Amino acid sequence: VPDRTANVPRGMRRQLFACKSIDRLIADSEHPRQRLAKSLGPWSLTALGIGAIIGSGIFVLTGTAAAGEHFEAPSLLHAQVMDLVLNFIQHGNLSGALLHGRPAAGPAIAVSFILVAVACSFAGLCYAELASMIPIAGSAYTYSYATLGEFFAWVIGWDLILEYAVGNVAVAVGFAGYFKAQLSSFGVNLSDRWSTPVWSEGHLTGAWFNMPAFLVIFLLTLLLLRGVRESAGANNVMVALKIAAILIFLVVGGMLVHPVNWHPFAPSGFRGIVTGGAIVFFTYIGFDVVSTAAEESIRPQRDMPVGIIASLIVCALLYVGVALVLLGMMPYATFASGPAADAPVAFALKALGVHPAFLAIIVIGAMTGMVSCLLVFQYGQVRIWFAMSRDRLLPALFSALHPRFQTPHWSTWIACAAVGVPAGLFDIGDAADLTNIGTLFAFVLVSIGVIVLRRSDPGRPRGFRVPFVPVFPLISVVLCLGLMSGLLLITWIRFVVWLGIGLAIYFGYSRHRSEFAAK
C-alpha cells in the first residue's frame, strides 16, 4: 500500500500525528498555575447539559416540525447537499434540489423526539466514556489530541470555536429581539438604532448597535469571571425556572387537550416521523458542553457520565411531553404558517383563552432558556481555549488564571468581545447552521476516538464504558454524517472556508509553538 504521506517531511509528519498521552494531559492539568478549581457535582453537571440543550426551541420548533413545510430554495447554494447528490444521480441535473418539502409528522413528532434522543445517545455514550477517562477541559479537542494527533486536535478545536461562538451570536440576537418585543408589549419601546443589528439579510438596517444582544453577553461575562461555582449556581436557578415553565405548560395545556386532535397520529407515516426527526435533531445539541467541565468536576469518573446521559434523558422527556400536549390542544395543521408557526405554544394558550399570567410564564421560560444557553456555551468556549493554550497551540494569554477567582479571565473577556460585538452588529441568519455542522463533526471524531482508545489503551480504567464497541460508535458516525449531508451547500462552503483559515493559523503559528515542535 503506498504511503500517502510520503511527500510530507518526516519531522512534520511525526508532529502532525503526534498524540499526547492521557497521563501527560492529566499531569499538565495539575500544574499549580493552570489548575482549575473543582466544584461541580452531578446536579450542576446535569444542569449544564439541560441549560445548553433546552433554549427557546422547545416553545417554537415543535409546531413547525409537526405541520411540515414546503418551499423553494433561492439558489443551489441554499439546497441540501444530499438533495443535490440524489438529483444528479437520478436526473442528471441539480434543479430538483431547489424544491424542499418535509411531510407533516403530526402528533407523531413525539415519536420523532424519542428516535432522535436514541440517535443522540450513541454520541452521548461516546462522550461519557471519554469524559470519564480523560477528565480534562477541552472536550472533543482533548480527546482528539489523545487519539488522533495534534493536527486533528487543532482542526476540532478550531471547529469548536466556530460552533460555540456562532451559536451564541445567533442566540444573543434572538434574545435581543425577544426582549425588545416583550418590553414593547408593556409600552416600553426601545430605539431601533440601539436594539437592532447593523447588518441583516444582506443589507444595512440604519441601526448603530444591537445593545441588548451585547449587554446580555457582557453581564454573563461578569458572572463567569467570578468563578465556576457562582456560574453553575446561576445556571441551576435558570434551569429550574425554565423546567418549571415547561411543567406549568404541561399541566395547564394538559387540561385543554382534546384526544381527537391526535388523530391521525402519523398523517405521513414513517416518512413524516423521520423528516420531523431531522428538524428536531438540533434541539438536542448542547450535551457535549458538559464534557468541557470535566476538569472542574469533583468526581469526573462518576459524575461526567451522569451529567451527559441524565441531561439527554430529562430533555427528551420534556420534549415529548410538550409535543403531545401542544398537538392535543390544537390540530397539527394549525401550526403550518403565520403566528402559530412562529410561537406555537404561546399561540395555542392565547387562542384557547388561557389567563395572560400563564403566557407570561412561558415568556419567562423562553427568555431564561436563551440566557442559560448563552451562559453555558460561553463557559464551554473559554474552556476549549484554555485547553488549547495550555498545549501551546494558542498564546499563553488564553490559559492565564485570575489570581483570586481561578478562572481564565483573559479568555473570558476575549470570548465576550468575540461574541458580543458580532451580536451587536450582525443578524447572521442561516449562517447559524455552522453550529450544527461543527457539532456533528465533533461527534464524528469523538466516536472514532472511542474505538481508537479501546485498541490503543484497553486497560486504562474507565468510569463508563460504551457497550458494543465498535458497533455503537460506528452507528454514531453514520448518523452524524447522514445529518451533515442534509445541511445546505452554503453551510458546507462556509465550514470549509473556516477550516482553511484555521489551517493557515496552525501552519503559520501553532505548529511552530507546539510542545512537539522541537521533537
Q: PLM ranges: what are they?
A:
Residues F59-T62, F122, I136, D159-G177, ...:
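Membrane-helix boundary/coupling elements in multi-pass transport proteins
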Residues T205-W208, L220, P267, L397-H409, ...:
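C-terminal membrane-solvent junction of multi-pass transporters and transport-like membrane proteins
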Residues K20-A37, H70, L77, V81, ...:
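Helix-loop-helix junctions that connect adjacent transmembrane segments
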Residues E72-A105, T142-Y143, G149, K180-D192, ...:
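TM-loop-TM module centered on a large, flexible mid-protein loop between adjacent transmembrane helices
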Residues A176, W208-L256, P267-F270, I308-L312, ...:
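Membrane-interface loop-to-helix entry segments
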Residues A181, I246-F249, W385, T435-R462, ...:
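Hydrophobic alpha-helical segments of multi-pass membrane transport proteins
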Residues P2-G106, S121, L125, I136-A137, ...:
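Membrane-interface "cap" regions at the ends of multi-pass membrane proteins
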Residues V60-E201, S311-V314, F495-L499, L503:
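Extracellular loop-to-transmembrane helix junctions
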